[in-house]
């Protein structure tokens, strides 16, 4: 099982395990600020994605947790300051209390910004779901992760992928004994298109609602090994209660 995250080693971003690859594979360039809810989590380098759900809170994956996170909003090219960005430090990161780092069940985290973001056409929140999305629903997945299924190539600009939610039966067949009720698969069983390392924590948006968080998979864009995502619809109550009490 691989999680889509990086380690900084001697100043370089390295994906692990060693046989895995890096970013959105088989996707396309989103276009500057066309995904205004997408954020980059930065600790001196981009290491995960996230989604802005209101002016002061971001949703990401629990496996992206680390101290000293800077949230970067309004980004397109993450290696160039283009003028539309807002860089805001995290004041607290709240990992789901039932997160299991071995199974990646409950792979969700909330990040509170030290100050509220200024919302505009380039920085905007995404709505939480009011119900779960059904199999076959087309979704938009985005991130700055690896774009190769073998080898590594990290993009400067945000990449997008349109992909369908797969049936629970297809998902469980792909990963026997590993899929919980808090996960879903999305993508293409024939391979070639997938999220990858560096995309972790980022959004899966279906019909204008945040339905998924990039969580894990086996390799990237491999045949019969689709991406696995945290099922956000199961956590709306926890998200609202946590925000209200913090």
Curated annotation (Swiss-Prot):
Autocatalytic cleavage after Lys-23 leads to beta-trypsin by releasing a terminal hexapeptide. Subsequent cleavage after Lys-148 leads to alpha-trypsin. Further cleavage after Lys-193 yields pseudotrypsin. A cleavage may also occur after Arg-122. Residues 18-23 form a propeptide. The keyword Cell wall biogenesis/degradation does not apply. Is inhibited by scorpion cyclotide trypsin inhibitor TopI1. Synthesized in the acinar cells of the pancreas. GO terms for biological process: digestion; proteolysis. GO terms for cellular component: extracellular space; serine protease inhibitor complex. It catalyses: Preferential cleavage: Arg-|-Xaa, Lys-|-Xaa. Interacts with SERPINA1. Its cofactor is Ca(2+). Binds 1 Ca(2+) ion per subunit. Keywords: Calcium, Digestion, Disulfide bond, Hydrolase, Metal-binding, Protease, Secreted, Serine protease, Signal, Zymogen. CDD domains: Tryp_SPc. Substrate binds at residues 194-195, 197-198, 200. The active site is at residues 63, 107, 200. This is Serine protease 1. Ca(2+) binds at residues 75, 77, 80, 85. The lineage of its organism: Eukaryota, Metazoa, Chordata, Craniata, Vertebrata. Belongs to the peptidase S1 family. Residues 1-17 form the signal peptide. Disulfide bonds join 30-160, 48-64, 132-233, 139-206, 171-185, 196-220. Gene3D superfamilies: Trypsin-like serine proteases (2.40.10.10).
